[in-house]
Amino acid sequence: MIPLNSNLTQLKRSAIRVYTDLARRTPGCVMLTLGEPDFDTPAPIRRAAWDALEQGQTHYAPNQGTAELRAAIARAETRRGNPTAPEQVLVTVGASQALFTALLGILNPGEEVIVPVPAFSLYETIITIAGGKMVPLDV
């Protein structure tokens, strides 16, 4: 068997998953753990996704994101007062992937990352997998 990355041996089960499991087992408990919407995806979004599939948009997008999406994000950022070119935009599936990708790109083994706490529990996992050490900063 191929040995796992030694950083993985330092990981603990995510506290948010522990609390989510507990909430699911507790009758009448309101779950405020994962930040997941309590409604289905709106119909216009589902229709747009279906239309895209019907038009053959079934392949991987470019690594940085589609040119159209990157241009739209750049325009939105520019309107917010942050002049941005599409070439400066990298699209990810969410904030966690963005943080993970950024830290893998800049963090060297053993470097410390200061994180204001309380914080989302996945941050420590991301830092650990990237080879760093989380330093909590009470705020």
Provide a role label for each language-model segment:
Residues 9-94, 101:
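N-terminal small-domain helix-loop-helix segment of the aminotransferase-like
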Residues 104-139:
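PLP-dependent aminotransferase-like
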Residues 98-99, 123:
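Short, hydrophobic alpha-helical packing/hinge segments within bilobed ligand-binding/sensory domains
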